[in-house]
């Protein structure tokens, strides 16, 4: 089976709940884009969607969220560009190496105010470990054989990650709550 993700293939390393953040770097040999995160990530997960940046040969990305106010570009920001300005998550990638450093939501959205980041781009240890796998079936859209999907889901379960074809139940509940509040079916403050 191809690599799920380098940080998952051989088991998951537990993060440090007291970890305070670190720096992310693009893959350029010189003039690396540097992004500083002033907090640990939350909801870190394997993602099979076709939009997320993935390491070479990996079927999934590993991506978590941090408050947007905890994200700052601290070196070579001139090398960043937004991959698709029409997407809900505006992925800021290095123009030279293509690595996505952070994704920001600027439209009205349940996750607005949170930035999506790939902690594998950090040399620091202690980031929250992946909590679940999302959009698992989406790897089929990228050419993965449907007949091999059971093995992918079993690999996730074997390392302790629940595979979902959407987000985790807690995140789906947040989206549904946001939608109900916007429509007036629930009060704006619960």
Swiss-Prot record:
> Molecular function terms in GO for this entry?
S-(hydroxymethyl)glutathione synthase activity; zinc ion binding
Q: What class of enzyme is it?
A: lyase
Enzymatic reactions: S-(hydroxymethyl)glutathione = glutathione + formaldehyde
Question: Pathway of this protein?
Answer: One-carbon metabolism; formaldehyde degradation; formate from formaldehyde (glutathione route): step 1/3
Q: How is the cofactor bound?
A: Binds 2 Zn(2+) ions per subunit.
* Binding residue positions for Zn(2+) 2: 47, 49, 52
Identify which cofactors the protein needs according to its UniProt entry. Answer: Zn(2+)
Location of the CENP-V/GFA domain: 19-165
What biological process terms from GO does the record include?
A: formaldehyde catabolic process
Q: Could you tell me the EC number(s) of this protein?
A: 4.4.1.22
Database matches in InterPro entries: CENP-V/GFA, Formald_GSH, Mss4-like_sf
- Which keywords does this Swiss-Prot/TrEMBL entry list? Lyase, Metal-binding, Zinc
| Residues that bind Zn(2+) 1 | 26, 28, 94, 97
All disulfide bonds of the chain are none
Q: What does this protein do?
A: Catalyzes the condensation of formaldehyde and glutathione to S-hydroxymethylglutathione.
NCBIfam families attached here? formald_GSH, PRK05417.1
Which family does the entry's similarity section mention?
Belongs to the Gfa family.
Under the heading PANTHER family, the entry gives:
CENP-V_GFA DOMAIN-CONTAINING PROTEIN-RELATED, GFA DOMAIN-CONTAINING PROTEIN
Q: Which HAMAP family has this protein been placed in?
A: Formald_GSH
**UniProt-recorded name of the protein:** Putative glutathione-dependent formaldehyde-activating enzyme
Record lineage: Eukaryota, Fungi, Dikarya, Ascomycota, Pezizomycotina
């Amino acid at each position: 089976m191809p690599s799920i993700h380098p940080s998952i293939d051989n088991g998951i390393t537990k993060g440090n709940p007291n970890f305070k953040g670190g720096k992310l770097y693009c893959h350029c040999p010189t003039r690396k884009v540097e992004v500083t995160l002033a907090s640990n990530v939350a909801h870190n997960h394997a993602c099979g969607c076709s939009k997320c940046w993935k390491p070479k040969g990996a079927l999934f990305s590993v991506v978590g969220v941090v408050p947007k106010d905890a994200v700052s570009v601290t070196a070579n920001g001139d090398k960043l560009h937004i991959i698709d300005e029409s997407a809900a998550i505006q992925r800021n990638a290095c123009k030279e190496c293509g690595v996505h450093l952070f994704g920001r939501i600027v439209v009205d959205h349940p996750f607005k105010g949170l930035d999506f980041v790939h902690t594998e781009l950090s040399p620091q240890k202690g980031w929250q470990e992946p909590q679940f796998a999302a959009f698992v079936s989406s790897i089929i859209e990228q050419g993965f054989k449907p007949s091999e999907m059971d093995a992918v889901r079993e690999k996730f379960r074997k390392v302790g990650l629940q595979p979902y074809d959407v987000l985790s139940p807690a995140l789906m509940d947040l989206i549904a709550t946001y939608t109900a509040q916007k429509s007036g079916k629930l009060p704006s403050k619960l």
